């Protein structure tokens, strides 16, 4: 059994056997999507969230085990590792407690207490702590000598030793932590000499701010930390000093007298000089970590919604990157997303060549049989969209507004240069907008998630944890949808379970040299793609039109024989079984349960036979803004207008209502009932109706409400 199984099972409230099996699969190199989809019997039908939690817990415990090895070695080298201490360290699995145990033995720079110990004052410190000496000054005289010049120095040295002892005592530290947990206050003040700077005004809400730390939301804490990093704010976390000191004294000072006074002074010094700064730093780090985790969860959920946005599918698309002076960049794409034509038109000021631009658009739509248009949502988007809606075409053309976030990042990237070496960044950016409409997932995986514009303080959080979380989300989304083996880009294939950059490149090269894959089994001919990689990736790769219909489904090749047996028992071929719903309903899956295959897998197989290769993302919806509203000045309080959710945070949702500035629906304005998390009510890119609650023309801020709006 894995050494961490019991700990993880208890921590996550999961069954030990399921945790043990999951850890074994992870150890074998299985990916989370693979385990979740194809090893349900072993995991007890766990979802990706639980499997990811097990993987993270195992990683943390492994790191702690390594830390314990270092600690044990260090203490042993000092000759201070007793059997009791060793046992305590080995049994400890709380990071804070572990560091507290280690603190008295931790190598540190030469402290006042160490200097006092070197001067032989440890016995005097113990004498004072015992608090039975009636005349401490007289006792201190015995310690005056070469290293201690007088009684005062002796007593001060003893107090320094007591202060360090108190500050390194586990109970003392936990007492102060308790006070901080109950009553710590986070305070933010403006740096006086920077108060009037324009950039500082972004943090004006925090110029004189104070709040209990336990009530401080993640977005407020991250905003304060950003202001602090920029040099505009001073942020501190503190508890009630007097209460903390009283608590310590109740533990260390017994009765009244000269000894007690000296010990009390040492305790006060321990708190102010050593304990308080240490615990403040600890709580600052813990609160930042908690805020980071919350912000990363928000970002990850937004990214998931964005990646799983409904695709238009394989249709001929005209992509339009709007602009005024630089014109509107138009790119015509075929149904596979290949660039077949591009040109620039100038319908807006300052050139105002609207009639020529209209004629050019009509010509391109007819020539390339354009079925849909993707209009970027940046500069001149509203004007361009209105203009395109006014044009008459000889066949129906649907017009969609598409987010441009990150398109400019993509257009200058190596991926874009490799795809379009002969085109400039404007063409590449426009192509990306068009492809996002056709298949958001396939296009957005090419862009650094942090550039997609759906985060909350994404540049302020732990970047390593953020990248880890977002990579996990991308991989989860790619594998939940499945990937067309014959059309997927190298970059998209990289995220398929079991592949990675090298095998993705090898697949694309094999495809280029040998033509389209006819079956999943052919994957085994790809250089370096061995049995393990095949097992991990095969179920997530699709081959539309394959001879075996299972090759275009989520049924894993390891279960083909089972489906063939089902078909044989019905007296038909697999192809006939897939095409005949009535036959499928006749199958009693309980007959096919075995030691390896249980009801969860069989249920999944039947769902795939019913709708093989079904895309879970749904269908794209058209949207139009209120035609009477084009600028923020057109808004009036009380108006009810349509909008698109562009970003979701812990404090609310931002909604584009077509006036160049997104409005905010604060979480308190989302419903008449209490809402803890905005994502309970809205999804990214959801079409919503909102009421204008407030308009601040000077600051270009719009407050919106969804209360009572249908």
Language model segments and positions:
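A glycine-rich phosphate-binding loop feature that marks nucleotide/adenosyl-phosphate handling sites
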Residues: 178-185, 320-324, 378-383, 402-409, ...
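Short, ordered loop/turn segments at secondary-structure junctions
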Residues: 38-40, 129, 240, 322, ...
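C-terminal accessory/binding modules appended to enzymatic or scaffolding proteins
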Residues: 13, 310-312, 475-509, 627-665, ...
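Duplex nucleic acid-engaging cores and interfaces of nucleic-acid transaction enzymes
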Residues: 50-53, 60, 64-319, 325-422, ...
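Long, charge-rich intrinsically disordered scaffolds of nucleic-acid metabolism proteins
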Residues: 97, 101, 400, 406, ...
């Amino acid at each position: 059994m894995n050494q961490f199984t019991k700990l993880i099972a208890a921590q996550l409230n999961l069954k030990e056997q399921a945790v043990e099996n999951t850890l074994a699969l992870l150890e074998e190199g299985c990916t989370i999507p693979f385990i979740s989809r194809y090893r349900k019997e072993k995991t007890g039908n766990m979802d990706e969230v639980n499997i990811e939690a097990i993987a993270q817990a195992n990683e943390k415990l492994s790191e702690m085990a390594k830390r314990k090895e270092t600690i044990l070695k260090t203490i042993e080298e000092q000759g201070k590792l007793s059997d009791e201490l060793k046992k305590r360290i080995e049994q400890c699995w709380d990071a804070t407690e572990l560091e507290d145990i280690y603190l008295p033995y931790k190598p540190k720079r030469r402290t006042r207490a160490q200097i006092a110990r070197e001067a032989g004052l440890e016995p005097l410190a113990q004498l004072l702590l015992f608090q039975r000496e009636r005349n401490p000054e007289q006792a201190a005289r015995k310690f005056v000598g070469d290293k201690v010049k007088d009684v005062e120095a002796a007593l001060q040295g003893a107090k320094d030793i007591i202060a360090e002892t108190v500050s390194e005592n586990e109970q003392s530290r936990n007492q102060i932590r308790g006070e901080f947990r109950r009553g710590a206050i986070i305070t933010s003040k403006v740096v006086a000499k920077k108060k009037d700077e324009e950039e500082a005004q972004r943090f004006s809400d925090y110029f004189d701010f104070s709040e209990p730390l336990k009530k401080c939301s993640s977005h407020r804490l991250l905003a304060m930390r950003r202001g602090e990093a920029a040099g505009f704010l001073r942020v501190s976390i503190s508890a009630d000093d007097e209460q903390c000191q009283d608590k310590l004294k109740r533990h260390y000072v017994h009765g009244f007298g000269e000894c007690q006074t000296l010990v009390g002074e040492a305790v006060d010094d321990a708190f102010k000089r050593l304990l308080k700064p240490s615990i403040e730093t600890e709580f600052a780090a813990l609160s930042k970590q908690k805020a980071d985790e919350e912000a990363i969860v928000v970002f990850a959920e937004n990214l998931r919604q964005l990646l799983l946005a409904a695709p238009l599918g394989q249709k001929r698309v005209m992509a339009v990157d709007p602009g005024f002076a630089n014109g509107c960049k138009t790119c015509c794409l075929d149904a596979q997303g290949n660039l077949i034509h591009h040109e620039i038109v100038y319908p807006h000021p300052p050139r105002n060549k609207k009639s020529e631009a209209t004629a050019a658009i009509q010509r391109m739509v007819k020539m390339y049989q354009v079925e849909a248009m993707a209009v970027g949502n940046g500069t001149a988007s509203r004007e361009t969209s209105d203009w395109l809606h006014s044009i008459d075409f000889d066949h129906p053309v649907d017009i969609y507004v598409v987010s441009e976030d990150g398109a400019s990042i993509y257009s200058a990237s190596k991926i874009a240069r490799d795809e379009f070496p002969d085109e400039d960044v404007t063409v590449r950016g426009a192509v990306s907008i068009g492809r996002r409409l056709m298949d958001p997932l396939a296009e957005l995986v090419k862009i650094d998630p942090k550039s997609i514009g759906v985060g909350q303080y994404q540049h302020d959080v732990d970047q390593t944890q953020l990248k880890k979380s977002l990579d996990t989300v991308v991989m989860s989304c790619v594998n939940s949808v499945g990937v067309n083996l014959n059309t997927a880009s190298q970059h998209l294939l990289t995220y398929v379970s079991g592949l990675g950059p090298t095998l993705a490149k090898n697949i694309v090269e094999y495809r280029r040299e040998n033509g389209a894959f006819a079956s999943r089994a052919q994957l085994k001919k790809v250089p370096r793609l061995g049995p393990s990689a095949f097992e991990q990736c095969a179920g997530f790769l699709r081959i539309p039109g394959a001879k075996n219909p299972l090759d275009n489904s989520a049924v894993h090749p390891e279960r083909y024989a089972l489906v063939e047996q089902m078909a044989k028992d019905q007296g038909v071929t697999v192809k006939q079984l897939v095409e005949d719903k009535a036959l499928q309903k006749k199958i009693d899956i309980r007959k096919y349960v075995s030691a390896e295959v249980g009801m969860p897998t069989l249920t999944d197989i039947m769902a795939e036979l019913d709708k093989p290769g079904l895309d879970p993302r749904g269908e794209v919806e058209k949207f139009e803004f209120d035609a009477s509203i084009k600028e923020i000045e057109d808004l009036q309080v009380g108006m009810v207008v349509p909008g698109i959710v562009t970003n979701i945070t812990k404090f609310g949702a931002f909604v584009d209502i077509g006036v160049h500035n997104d409005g905010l629906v604060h979480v308190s304005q989302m419903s008449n009932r209490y809402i803890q998390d905005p994502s309970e009510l809205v999804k990214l890119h959801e079409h919503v109706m909102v009421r204008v609650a407030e308009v601040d023309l000077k600051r270009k801020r719009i407050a919106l409400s969804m209360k009572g709006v249908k």
